From Swiss-Prot:
Name of this protein: Auxin transporter-like protein 3
Cytoplasmic-side positions: 1-57, 99-134, 192, 252-264, 334-354, 398-426
Family: Belongs to the amino acid/polyamine transporter 2 family. Amino acid/auxin permease (AAAP) (TC 2.A.18.1) subfamily.
Native source organism of the sequence: Arabidopsis thaliana
Lineage: Eukaryota, Viridiplantae, Streptophyta, Embryophyta, Tracheophyta
Record field: transmembrane: 58-75, 78-98, 135-155, 171-191, 193-213, 231-251, 265-285, 313-333, 355-375, 377-397, 427-447
Localization: Cell membrane
PANTHER family: OS05G0424000 PROTEIN-RELATED
Length: 470
C-alpha cells in the first residue's frame, strides 16, 4: 500500500504539511505501469512548477505580440516586454509570499489540505477578510473565464490557416467540444507531461516565426510607422501587460508542489526563458511585415503556407488546449466548492459537475471572436487588478501591522531594501498599473474593441478572414 505519511517540513518559520509522493517512497515494488503513471502524470517538483509557469505564460500571445509591436514600434515593444516581465515576476513573488503566510497560519491551526486545493480568493479571505475574498473571486474568475475564451478563439483562428473550408465560428464550436475534455484532468499535479510538451511546442513556434520571417525578408514597400496614435500605443502596451500577467494560477501551481516554499524565484526564471521566445519572434515578424500587422493580429496569417507553418499551427492548437485547461481548472475548483463536490474522491462525478463551466466560455468565444483586441481589453480591465494591483495592495495591508512583519514567514530580500524597499516597489506597481494599465490602457483597449464590434459585428462568422478562394 502506498505511503500516506505526513511530514512536518521546517523552512524558516514555515511549517508545511508535506505528503510523500504516492508509490515513490515506501513502495519499491511498484509496477512499471505505476512508475510510468507517476512519471508522466504526478508532478509536484520545482521543475514541474517551472514548466507550468513558462508554458502557461507564453500561449497564444506569441502570435499577437508582433501585432503589438506594430502598434508600439520596435523600441517600445522591447522595453515594455522587459518592464512588464520584471513587474509580473515581482507580483508573482508577492502572491507566493501571501500563499505561504496563509498556509502556515492555517496549518498551525491543524487545518488539513489533503483533499482541498487552496485558491487565491481563499488566501485573501484568510489574511484580509471576506471583502477582499469577494474582490479576488470576482476579478480572478472573470479573468480566467476570458482567458479560457481567448484560447478558444485562438484555436479557431489558427486552424483556419490550415483548413479554410469551415469558417472560424464553426471551428469554435468544434474546439469548444474538444476543450471540454479538460474536465477530466483532476488538478495541476496532473499537468506534468502537458506542461513539458506545451513549452516545447511554443519554443518551436517561436523559432519558426523568427527564422521564417528572416528568410522571407522585408515585404515590398514595408513601413514601420508605429506608434501612430495614442489608442494603438496603449492597446499594444496592455497586450504585453496581459502577456506577463499569466500568474492568476500561481496559487494553484504552488499548491500542486510538494514543497511550495521553493516557488519564490520560479516565475522569474520562467519569465527569463519566455523572453528568449517572445523578443526574437515579435521583433523578426515586425521587421519583415511592419504595418501590415495592424490588420493581421495573428502573425501566422502573413507567413506563406508551408509544412513548417502547418506544423506550427498544429502545435499551437495542442498548446492552446493545454492552456485552456490551465485557465479553466481554477474555475472548475471554484464551481466544485460552490456546489459541494470539491472533496469528492470520484473523479467522474467531479468531471460531470464541471461541464456547466465550459458553456459560458463557449458562448463568449462565439460572441467576441476578436483575436488580438480582446487580449488588450482583458489585460487592461482584468489583469491589471487581478495579478498586479490586488497582490501589491494585499501584501502591503497584510504586513502593515508591526507584529505581522516581525512574525512574517517570508521576509523581503535585502536586495530590494527590506520592508521599506518592498513597500516602495508595491506603491509604484499600484500607481503605474492603475494609471497606465487600467486608465490609459483601458481607454485605448475599449476604443479599439468597440471599433472591432462596429466593423465586424458581434457573432461574426470569420474575423479578419481573407476572401475565400474556391
Amino acid at each position: 500500500m502506498a505511503a500516506e505519511k505526513i511530514e512536518t517540513v521546517v523552512a524558516g518559520n514555515y511549517l508545511e504539511m508535506e505528503r510523500e509522493e504516492e508509490n515513490i517512497s515506501g513502495n519499491k515494488k511498484s509496477s512499471t505501469k505505476t512508475k510510468l503513471s507517476n512519471f508522466f502524470w504526478h508532478g509536484g517538483s520545482v521543475y514541474d512548477a517551472w514548466f507550468s509557469c513558462a508554458s502557461n505564460q507564453v500561449a497564444q500571445v506569441l502570435l499577437t505580440l508582433p501585432y503589438s509591436f506594430s502598434q508600439l514600434g520596435m523600441m517600445s515593444g522591447i522595453l515594455f516586454q522587459l518592464f512588464y516581465g520584471l513587474m509580473g515576476s515581482w507580483t508573482a513573488y508577492l502572491i507566493s509570499v501571501l500563499y505561504v503566510e496563509y498556509r502556515t497560519r492555517k496549518e498551525r491551526e491543524k487545518f488539513d489540505f489533503r483533499n482541498h486545493v487552496i485558491q487565491w480568493f481563499e488566501v485573501l479571505d484568510g489574511l484580509l477578510g471576506k471583502h477582499w475574498r469577494n474582490l479576488g473571486l470576482i476579478f480572478n474568475c472573470t479573468f480566467l473565464l476570458f482567458g479560457s475564451v481567448i484560447q478558444l478563439i485562438a484555436c479557431a483562428s489558427n486552424i483556419y490557416y490550415i483548413n479554410d473550408k469551415l469558417d472560424k465560428r464553426t471551428w469554435t464550436y468544434i474546439f469548444g467540444a474538444c476543450c471540454a475534455t479538460t474536465v477530466f484532468i483532476p488538478s495541476f499535479h496532473n499537468y506534468r507531461i502537458w506542461s513539458f510538451l506545451g513549452l516545447a511546442m511554443t519554443t518551436y513556434t517561436s523559432w519558426y516565426l523568427t527564422i521564417a520571417s528572416l528568410l522571407h525578408g522585408q515585404a515590398e514597400d514595408v513601413k514601420h510607422s508605429g506608434p501612430t496614435t495614442m489608442v494603438l500605443y496603449f492597446t499594444g502596451a496592455t497586450n504585453i501587460l496581459y502577456t506577463f500577467g499569466g500568474h492568476a494560477v500561481t496559487v494553484e501551481i504552488m499548491h500542486a508542489m510538494w514543497k511550495p516554499q521553493k516557488f519564490k524565484a520560479i516565475y522569474l526564471l520562467a519569465t527569463i526563458y519566455v523572453l528568449t521566445l517572445t523578443l526574437p519572434s515579435a521583433s523578426a515578424v515586425y521587421w519583415a511585415f511592419g504595418d501590415k500587422l495592424l490588420t493581421h493580429s495573428n502573425a501566422l496569417s502573413l507567413l506563406p503556407k508551408t509544412g513548417f507553418r502547418d506544423t506550427a499551427v498544429i502545435l499551437m492548437l495542442i498548446h492552446q488546449f493545454i492552456t485552456f485547461g490551465f485557465a479553466s481548472t481554477p474555475l472548475y475548483f471554484v464551481w466544485e466548492k460552490l456546489i459541494g463536490v470539491h472533496e469528492t474522491k470520484s473523479m467522474f462525478k467531479r468531471a460531470m459537475a464541471r461541464l456547466p463551466v465550459v458553456v459560458p466560455i463557449w458562448f463568449l468565444a462565439i460572441i467576441f471572436p476578436f483575436f488580438g483586441p480582446i487580449n488588450s481589453a482583458v489585460g487592461s480591465l482584468l489583469v491589471s487588478f487581478t495579478v498586479y494591483i490586488i497582490p501589491a495592495l494585499a501584501h502591503m495591508l497584510t504586513f502593515a501591522p508591526a507584529p505581522s512583519r516581525e512574525n512574517a514567514v517570508e521576509r523581503p530580500p535585502r536586495v530590494v531594501g527590506g520592508w521599506m524597499g518592498t513597500y516602495c516597489i508595491n506603491i509604484f506597481v499600484v500607481v503605474w498599473v492603475f494609471v497606465v494599465g487600467f486608465g490609459f490602457g483601458g481607454w485605448a483597449s475599449m476604443v479599439n474593441f468597440v471599433r472591432q464590434i462596429d466593423t465586424f459585428g458581434l457573432f461574426t462568422k470569420c474575423y479578419q478572414c481573407p476572401p475565400h478562394k474556391p
